[in-house]
Amino acid sequence: MLHRATTTAAAAAAAALLLCPVQALVRPDGVGKLPALGWNSWNAFGCDIDEEKILTAANQIVNLGLKDLGYEYVNIDDCWSVKSGRNATTGRIMPDLTKFPDGISGLAEKIHNLGLKIGIYSSAGWTTCAGYPASLGNETIDAETFAEWGIDYLKYDNCGVPPDWQDQYSYCVPDSGDPATNPNGTCPNLQNPAPAVYDWRTSKTAERYRRMRDALLGVQDKRTILFSLCDWGQADVNEWGAETGNSWRMSGDISPNWPRISTIANLNSFELNSVDFWGHNDPDMLEVGNGNLTLAENRAHFALWAAMKSPLIIGTALDKIDQDHLSILSNKYLLTFHQDPQIGRPAYPYKWGYNPDWTFDPGHPAEYWSGPTSSGDVLVLMLNTESGPANRTAVWSEVPELKGRNNNNNSSSTGFQVTDAWTGSSLGCVQGGYSVELESHDVAVLVVSGEC
C-alpha cells in the first residue's frame, strides 16, 4: 500500500492506489457511506459559541440553498459543556445552559425541525483540547447521552490523553510543510519509531477510538451517530480508520492560508487508497471564506477536498458569507462527483506537472487529477501550484479514464464534449486536450463527457 509517501517509484505507487480498503464500518441505514456534508462551529467561532450562532448557521444552510445541495450536518465543536466537570450524581456531561438555555436536546429538536442533523464534539481523553470534560472511560454513558439528546454526528478529538493511554511508539505524520523536516514524506528525526512489523491496530490510540465506536454501536437501535475520528493522522489511522469510524483525520489542523492547504493536499494525495464507500480520509474542515485566501485559493481548496471525497464541513460564518464563496461551496458538478452513489473512489492524481510524478512536495502537490462518475463523465482538475500565472494543459490521452474511449487510438484528433465546472458553460467539442491560463493557486475543473 502506498503510505506516507515513502515510495517514489511511479509503478509501485500507482499499483498501491488500486488496493482495496480495509473492512469498513457499514451501517444498515446507509449513514457514513458517502462523505459527510455540513457545517462546524470551530473555524468560525472557536470557543465563542451559543445556541443563537448554531441556529443561525442551521437556518442559513436552509436559506442559502445548501440543504437542497446535500449539506445536512450542523456540528457543535468544543466548549459546549460545563467546564468544571460532570454531574456528580449521574456522571453525565452537562451542557452549559448559559450558552445553550434549552440544552443540547432542545437545540437538536430545533435543528431536526429544519430537516437537518446535529453533531457534537468530544475527545478520546480525559479533557477536550480546550480543557472541557471528555469521554475516555465514559464512552458508554456519553454515547447513551448523545443518543438521548438526538445527536447524529460525533467529532472525536485526540486531546487530554493520560500517560497510561499513550502509545508505546511514535508515528510519522509528515505534515510540517518543511521539506527539510519531512524529506520525501519521511520523519528522520522521529523519536522512538515503531518496528517495521508493528501493527498499529494494537496501539492504545486505536483502542481508545474503538471503545467509543463500540459504545456508539451499542446505542444504534436508538440512534445512528456518524463517527468522525480526529486523531490527526496518528497511529497509522489509515490502516484502521475505516473499521472504526466513518472518517478519520489524516493530518494536523488546517488553517486559512495556502501553504497549509497545499501541505495537507500533498500529503493526502499519497493516501487516497484508503478512501471508498463507508470510509473517508479527512483533511480537516473547510476554510472557504476564511482568512486571506484569494478567490483562486478558495476554489482550489474546495475542488481538491471535493475531488478527494473528503468530508466537506463548512467552517465559515454563513450569515456573513459573500456570493463568490457561496458559489464555490454550491458547485453542483463537484458536489455531484463527491456524492456519487455508485462510485466510492475519489479522483486520483495522474500527473504531477510541476514536479516529476510521485514527488512529495508540500509547496507543489500534484497538479493533474481525474476521477470517474457513474454517469460516464470524467472529472478532470488542473491546478497551478506556482506563485504566478501559468498555463496548464489536460491531454486526453494522458487521462486514465479517457483511454480506450475513442476510435482513434487516443490520437491528437480525439475529441470530447467538455463543460467548465466553474461557469457551467459548454466548451464544445475539444480535440486532443484543453489548455487554460490559471492564476496562482487556481484550479480548472472540467467535466469531460462523450466523444465528438
Swiss-Prot record:
Glycosylated residues in this chain: 87, 138, 184, 292, 391, 409-410
Name the record gives this protein: Probable alpha-galactosidase B
Homology family: Belongs to the glycosyl hydrolase 27 family.
PROSITE patterns associated with the record: ALPHA_GALACTOSIDASE
Pfam families, per database record: Melibiase_2 (PF16499), Melibiase_C (PF17801)
Disulphide-bonded residues: 47-79, 129-159
Location in the cell: Secreted
One Gene Ontology term of the molecular function aspect: alpha-galactosidase activity
Organism in which the protein naturally occurs: Talaromyces emersonii (Thermophilic fungus)
Top-level lineage group: Eukaryota
The reaction(s) this protein catalyses: Hydrolysis of terminal, non-reducing alpha-D-galactose residues in alpha-D-galactosides, including galactose oligosaccharides, galactomannans and galactolipids
This enzyme's EC code(s): 3.2.1.22
GO biological process, any: carbohydrate metabolic process
A single GO cellular-component term on record: extracellular region
Class of this enzyme: hydrolase
